[in-house]
């Protein structure tokens, strides 16, 4: 991963690097690899994440179709 340092502005380059790493999911991966995760725990975690994603998608679809309201005062 590369970040350009312009005009010796290291702080700006560090912020850009952190943003890229966050977008790529590197911090999350480092956290997950910090300790061993049993295969059964991994399956359970992935299944829970899939359920969470499906619920979020269903909620967004329902909001888009007008079945449920969004945030209060959003309209």
Swiss-Prot record:
Record carries keyword Transcription: no
BP term (GO), one: translation
A cellular component term, taken from the record's GO annotations: ribosome
Entries under InterPro entries matching the protein: Ribosomal_bS21, Ribosomal_bS21_CS, Ribosomal_bS21_sf
Keyword Ligase listed: no
Biased composition (Basic residues): 53-62
Disulfide bonds: none
Domain of life: Bacteria
GO molecular-function terms, A-Z: structural constituent of ribosome
Annotated region described as Disordered, given as residue ranges: 52-75
Keyword annotations: Ribonucleoprotein, Ribosomal protein
Family: Belongs to the bacterial ribosomal protein bS21 family.
The protein's name: Small ribosomal subunit protein bS21
Organism: Brucella anthropi (strain ATCC 49188 / DSM 6882 / CCUG 24695 / JCM 21032 / LMG 3331 / NBRC 15819 / NCTC 12168 / Alc 37)
Gene name of the encoded protein: rpsU
């Amino acid at each position: 991963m590369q970040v350009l340092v312009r005009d010796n502005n290291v702080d700006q380059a560090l912020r850009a690097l952190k943003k890229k790493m966050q977008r790529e999911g590197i911090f999350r991966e480092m956290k997950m690899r910090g300790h061993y995760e049993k295969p059964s725990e991994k399956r359970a975690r992935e299944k829970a994440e899939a359920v969470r994603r499906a619920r979020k998608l269903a909620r967004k679809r329902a909001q888009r179709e007008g079945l449920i309201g969004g945030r209060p005062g959003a309209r």
